[in-house]
Amino acid sequence: MTNKTTKIQATGKYVRLSTAKTRRVLNQIKGKKYQEAILILEFMTYKPCKIIKKILESAGNNALNLKYEKQNLIIKQAFANDGPKLKRFQPRAQGRAFRIQKPTCHITINLSIN
């Protein structure tokens, strides 16, 4: 007898957000039900919430494609990894330039069936 497990996952890559600030929001929704997490993200005022909500909805739609119902889903894993940093220069006085690093991150959300 084989145990068939399907992976319900959505990933957002090269998102122009700080990894630390994104993790702060992801920790709030880990282990929650799908509908509850959507509600939490809708009313939080942090910048990453809008993008995380989009990725979570994408994962929910992936589950619908596999014939699962959204009300039975739970967020099994939600994590953010560092992406490449965009390097920019800020002109300063007397011909100098300061280097600015704009962070990116990769957000992954895994769902499981309740």
Swiss-Prot record:
Keyword Thylakoid: no
Main location: plastid
Compartment(s): Plastid, Chloroplast
InterPro entries the record matches: Ribosomal_uL22, Ribosomal_uL22_bac/chlpt-type, Ribosomal_uL22_bac/org-type, Ribosomal_uL22_CS, Ribosomal_uL22_sf
Pfam family name, one: Ribosomal_L22
Keyword field contains rRNA-binding: yes
HAMAP family: Ribosomal_uL22_B
Role played: This protein binds specifically to 23S rRNA. The globular domain of the protein is located near the polypeptide exit tunnel on the outside of the subunit, while an extended beta-hairpin is found that lines the wall of the exit tunnel in the center of the 70S ribosome.
Protein name, per record: Large ribosomal subunit protein uL22c
Annotated organism of origin: Gracilaria tenuistipitata (Red alga)
